[in-house]
């Protein structure tokens, strides 16, 4: 195959200014694969994503989760060309890459990223791309590996059970049209992928082969490749690696003969060569998703127009949440697909508004709401949901009926009858904001994530989206290069056009946002009483088989409730003019000119020499300081960053206030009070892409920190807003009301309630900080302090914080246009930090020591156990081994080498072979003063069992791996590959297998507002890292991996490394310092096992037509006490009493025994006495010592504050 067989399409993409150095191309390979090529000479890595137009909506009815299982098997089971199982994952790990995959209802996406390293003169990316591509040609669905991947899916599913987002999505399925595939459970679990196939004699290998053959062919695949290579080289890579994936014609003719297939294929290629090359209109005909799925759905909508039940009530102890879901289908409607895409985007902006006149503002003022989110969810092609999610207070939960009535009977009608000029102003401004936000967005610095998004977008209806919008992802009313951009001028014709758009949008709201089309999803305490008076078709409370939550469904009718609202003077309104839109971007014609310049620069980038370049790395500069103040700036390379945006952080340390749980809580309440008072004024800034954070110190000292990003003049306005409001709170006793303080306390309480209900891995990680960090207080201490926070004590604290001496750190990045103005304003209105240098006064003495970490004593082998959330059935452990002080470069270097060793062995051994849990992470962990290595696991097994398995792994690693190394093996297998990664600057972090290095940097601010993409983009992450290093006094500004001593490593011998391992890591070391944090589910293990058994048995009996009441079945399961044999006996007795024992039969009883036993063995084997032995597990089992015990006995810490009381 040659490049002449590739069809190229000329597209002038809409791209952000930050993409102007990149080159983009869309092309079609001879086999029908549509590919997007991105050449970026600044990339330090290369990435690829492949999306197949198939997903869980193609699952056979009897094998829920088959698509998900296929996704797992594709990458793990090998291919005919590369048959070694796990080869791909091993290569990714060895080269410090990342990989992932996900399955939705209609798409399956596989993607990976690798540093630009070379091996024997060949780019590693090219060789691994060949392995990756082979999976989509001739995969091996090795039956020996199927059970392992089913276990992984089961563990993944168990991790999802406690996720609020997953619960709501599944609840939407319960309310959906049962005739649509969306209504079916899709993730898969051990029941759907193992029990049912065994019961029905279904061969999974055969099902996987059939699924693959029917769906994995050229025309069903889209591809995105990104790297620093030229577009021609990347196109050649796409062609050489993926061009021989079979097209649909070859798949259809596969059973005929090789000759016939070959002839058909060559004929097809010849035809394509003669077809309209570079034909833009041909690209617009690509509608891969529509073409594939519309045939399957046959005009069936995801949600019925007249459902029996329109509401679901989910029982939960978490913070109550209410979702209003309005299904939108492009079937049986006068609105075009274009209309629906445009208006649904505008709907999100309108109903997510928090400024005065909005629903959010009104409900928050009533004390019913703590958060309002408006978004769309794509359920299937042509079917989306407009979702309004309200995070409620307890008072809000008690007023759900009123809230729903307000939305339907007051908010929506006001939008229909309001002066249409307000709506026109909103539409015009929002269109402009969309263009500004897109043009000024930062460059995507996670190439594989961008590729995964784009390979999926390529399957959209490109006639509707239009090819230029591929990077933008949505259509606007007026695009930036549209000649109609002049419609912003107020001519008569233009006003008529905008009036027409406004009326059409109002009709969109009327058509879809009404009571008949509403679905109500509620999560909270549903057992406290009926939430609605009028409910029809109410079901009994039952337990969902898959997600195990209790719920009931009903049809809720909401009559008009004018009595309650007749006296309300609140007026709902559309968002008004945005004060934060800078003059420089408020002219559409200027924006159009900017876009055209950017587009031309990118278009002709191919004519420039393709020379690899990356941004010049500059260190922050200390430009001004005195004893109580530092001002830092960071200038960015103008070729790679926009000079139109600023990021500003200022951190104020209260020098005269003692760190304590009370002080931390007062600061958190202060942050929330600032948010409550200013959020409605600042919300318009968020619409344009500004962000802000308010946080108390993550390390517990008395520090208040602000971080603000956006256009410079707006950033200055936000700084002034926060400072002025803080001054009023601190100095005016009449300013802060009791109601505002109450709301702030509720927000803090909800934050801790949400944190305590987080997954057990996060709880264990935070638990490590609580035990070891000096000022990181326990949840109990914080809640007690919150209970004692009253208006008088809070105002006293704020006054002291304001009046007492302070230390300011000001850090500015990007545009420095307002740097001096911000510095002066802080001095004059808050900190008075410049008076010290001007008046020559003495510096303020710091009365209290800075944050620090407990230095674990040698010979420590301790653990502490916390309870997890009561709805989470999983357990977890963080097994932390302290290895060095942060400034101990040699031991830090050896710890990094150990992290690399873990990246090669930990996941393959503990997760894939030993199968101790779904989440298995291991690598470097950095605390304030110390560093160490951690192993983190989430599993159904107990914490102590996980501790034992980790000890076995470390013993195996030492005795059977490292001790068998020769010096040659050590250098060839471990040291030289690691040095190679260092030399090629590609050890950014082993995130895939290690998790975050510095947990303190991962703590989210108390208040964080703005677009999630902007808050986590490359510039913001860099800003946080630099800001934290300044605060810690680590002013060399090196990344952690840059502190590795390469010269030391080059001279390292096996003997020296073994000495480190045997002293610091080995379980046989008397000097090792180790601490485990165990999170244990409050649910009793046998209770969980019994609940699982009941749900599995209930499903089995229903499938086979056995009638038994739920209450009777529950009693049978409870009496069996987790014993499958006793369960079968009790079932036999039950049906014998009813003279129906003949129905069971020996075969059915055996199947029950087999299915229940196998299901419970996977998760509860240690409790019920099962053994876990299979081929690959046995191979490693013989090397693992099941009786391994550390030389230092494990001891339990009496309480989380043990070290704090003893050492601090």
UniProtKB/Swiss-Prot annotation:
- Compartments where located: Bud neck
Q: Which residues form the active site?
A: 71
Any idea which UniProt keywords this protein has?
Answer: Hydrolase, Metal-binding, Metalloprotease, Phosphoprotein, Protease, Zinc
Q: Which residues bind Zn(2+)?
A: 68, 72, 156
Broad class of enzyme this protein falls into = hydrolase
Name one cellular component (GO) term.
Answer: mating projection tip
The EC number of this protein is 3.4.24.-
Please state which protein family the record places this protein in: Belongs to the peptidase M16 family.
- Its protein name is Putative protease AXL1
């Amino acid at each position: 195959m040659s490049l002449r067989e590739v069809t190229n399409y000329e597209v002038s993409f809409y791209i952000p200014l930050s993409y102007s150095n990149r080159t983009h191309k869309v092309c079609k390979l001879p086999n029908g694969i549509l590919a997007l090529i991105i050449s970026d000479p600044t990339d330090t890595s290369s990435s690829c994503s492949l999306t197949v137009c198939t997903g869980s909506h193609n699952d056979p009815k009897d094998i829920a989760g088959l698509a998900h299982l296929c996704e797992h098997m594709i990458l793990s089971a090998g291919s005919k060309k590369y048959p070694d199982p796990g080869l791909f994952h091993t290569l990714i790990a060895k080269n410090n890459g990342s990989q992932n995959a996900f399955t939705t209802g209609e798409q399956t996406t596989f993607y990976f990223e690798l540093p630009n390293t070379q091996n024997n003169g060949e780019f590693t990316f090219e060789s691994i791309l060949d392995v990756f591509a082979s999976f989509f040609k001739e995969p091996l669905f090795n039956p020996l590996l199927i059970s392992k991947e089913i276990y992984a899916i089961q563990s993944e599913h168990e991790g999802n059970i406690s996720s609020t987002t997953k619960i709501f999505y599944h609840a939407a399925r319960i309310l959906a049209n049962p005739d649509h595939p969306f209504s079916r459970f899709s993730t898969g679990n051990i029941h759907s992928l193992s029990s049912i196939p065994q019961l029905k004699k279904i061969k999974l290998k055969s099902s996987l082969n059939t699924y693959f053959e029917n769906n994995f062919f050229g025309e069903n695949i889209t591809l995105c490749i990104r790297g620093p290579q030229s577009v021609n080289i990347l196109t050649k890579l796409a062609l050489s690696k993926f061009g021989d994936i079979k097209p649909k014609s070859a798949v259809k003719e596969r059973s005929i003969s090789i000759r016939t297939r070959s002839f058909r294929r060559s004929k097809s290629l010849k035809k394509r060569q003669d077809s309209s090359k570079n034909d833009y209109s041909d690209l617009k005909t690509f509608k891969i998703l529509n073409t594939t799925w519309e045939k399957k759905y046959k005009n069936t909508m995801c949600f019925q127009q007249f459902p029996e039940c329109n509401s679901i009530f989910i029982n939960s102890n978490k913070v109550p949440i209410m979702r209003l879901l309005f299904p939108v289908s492009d079937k049986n409607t006068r609105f075009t697909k274009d209309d629906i895409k445009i208006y649904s985007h505008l709907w999100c902006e309108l109903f997510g508004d928090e400024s005065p006149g909005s629903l959010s503002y009104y409900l928050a003022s009533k004390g019913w709401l703590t958060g309002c989110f408006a978004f769309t969810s794509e359920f299937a092609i042509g079917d989306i949901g407009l979702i309004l999610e309200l995070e409620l207070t307890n008072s809000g939960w008690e007023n759900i009926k009123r809230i729903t009535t307000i939305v339907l009977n007051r908010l929506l009608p006001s939008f229909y009858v309001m002066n249409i000029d307000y709506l026109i102003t909103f539409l015009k401004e929002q269109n402009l904001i969309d263009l500004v936000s897109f043009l000024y967005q930062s460059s995507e610095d996670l190439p594989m994530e961008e590729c995964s998004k784009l390979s999926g977008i390529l399957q959209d209806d490109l006639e509707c989206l239009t090819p230029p919008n591929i990077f933008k992802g949505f259509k606007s009313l007026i695009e930036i290069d549209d000649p109609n951009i002049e419609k912003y001028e107020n001519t008569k014709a233009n006003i008529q056009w905008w009036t027409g758009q406004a009326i059409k949008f109002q009709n969109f709201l009327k058509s879809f946002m009404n009571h008949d089309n509403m679905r109500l999803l509620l999560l909270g305490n549903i057992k406290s009483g009926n939430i609605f008076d009028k409910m029809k078709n109410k079901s009994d409370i039952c337990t969902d088989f898959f997600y195990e939550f209790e719920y009931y469904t009903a049809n809720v009718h909401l009559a008009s409730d004018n009595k309650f609202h007749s006296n309300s003077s609140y007026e709902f309104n559309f968002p008004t003019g945005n004060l934060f839109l800078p003059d420089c971007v408020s002219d559409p014609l200027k924006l159009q000119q900017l876009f055209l310049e950017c587009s031309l620069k990118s278009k002709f980038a191919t004519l420039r020499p393709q020379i690899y370049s990356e941004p010049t790395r500059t260190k922050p500069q200390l430009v001004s300081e005195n004893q109580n103040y530092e001002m830092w700036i960071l200038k960015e390379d103008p070729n790679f960053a926009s000079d139109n945006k600023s990021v500003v952080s200022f951190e104020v340390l209260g020098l005269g206030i003692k760190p304590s749980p009370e002080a931390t809580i007062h600061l958190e309440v202060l942050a929330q009070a600032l948010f409550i008072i200013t959020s409605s004024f600042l919300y318009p800034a968020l619409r344009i892409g500004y962000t802000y954070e308010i946080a108390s110190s993550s390390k517990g000292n008395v520090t208040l920190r602000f971080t603000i990003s956006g256009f410079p003049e707006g950033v200055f306005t936000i700084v002034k807003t926060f400072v002025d409001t803080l001054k009023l709170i601190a100095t005016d006793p009449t300013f802060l009301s009791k109601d505002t303080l109450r709301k702030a306390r509720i927000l803090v309480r909800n934050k801790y309630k949400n944190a305590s209900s987080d997954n057990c891995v996060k709880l264990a990680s935070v638990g490590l900080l609580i035990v070891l960090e000096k000022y990181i207080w326990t949840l109990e201490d914080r809640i007690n302090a919150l209970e004692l926070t009253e208006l008088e004590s809070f105002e006293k604290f704020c006054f002291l914080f304001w009046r007492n001496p302070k230390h300011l750190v000001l850090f500015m990045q990007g545009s420095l246009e307002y740097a001096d103005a911000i510095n002066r304003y802080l001095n004059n209105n808050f900190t008075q930090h410049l008076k010290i240098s001007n008046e020559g006064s003495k510096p303020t003495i710091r009365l209290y020591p800075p944050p620090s970490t407990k230095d674990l004593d040698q010979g420590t082998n301790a653990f502490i156990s916390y309870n997890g959330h009561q709805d989470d059935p999983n357990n977890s452990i963080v097994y932390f081994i302290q290895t060095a002080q942060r400034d101990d470069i040699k031991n830090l270097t050896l710890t990094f080498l150990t992290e690399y060793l873990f990246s090669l062995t930990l996941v393959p051994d503990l997760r894939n072979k030993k199968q101790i849990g779904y989440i298995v992470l291991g690598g470097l962990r950095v605390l304030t003063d110390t560093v160490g290595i951690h192993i983190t696991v989430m599993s159904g097994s107990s914490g102590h069992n996980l501790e034992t398995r980790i000890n076995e792994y470390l013993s195996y690693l030492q005795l059977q791996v490292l001790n068998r190394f020769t010096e040659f093996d050590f250098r060839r297998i471990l040291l030289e590959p690691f040095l190679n990664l260092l030399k090629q600057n590609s050890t950014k972090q082993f995130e895939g297998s290690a998790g975050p290095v510095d947990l303190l940097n991962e703590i989210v601010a108390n208040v964080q507002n703005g677009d999630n993409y902007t808050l986590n983009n490359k510039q913001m992450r860099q800003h946080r890292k630099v800001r934290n290093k300044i605060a810690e006094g680590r002013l060399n500004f090196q990344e952690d991996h840059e502190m590795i001593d390469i010269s030391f490593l080059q001279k390292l011998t096996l003997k020296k490394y073994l000495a480190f391992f045997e002293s610091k890591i080995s379980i046989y070391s008397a000097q090792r310092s180790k601490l485990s944090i165990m999170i244990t589910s409050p649910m009793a293990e046998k209770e969980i096992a019994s609940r699982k058994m009941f749900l599995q048995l209930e499903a089995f009996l229903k499938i086979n037509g056995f009638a038994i009441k739920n209450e009777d079945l529950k009693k049978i399961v409870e009496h069996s006490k987790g014993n499958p044999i006793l369960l079968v006996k009790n079932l036999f007795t039950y049906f014998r009493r009813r003279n129906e024992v003949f129905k069971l039969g020996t075969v059915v009883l055996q199947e029950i025994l087999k299915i229940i036993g196998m299901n419970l063995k996977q998760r509860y084997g240690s409790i019920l006495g099962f053994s876990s032995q299979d081929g690959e597990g046995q191979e490693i089992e013989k090397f693992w010592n099941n009786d391994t015990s550390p030389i230092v006995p494990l001891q339990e810490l009496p309480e989380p504050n043990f070290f704090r009381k003893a050492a601090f």
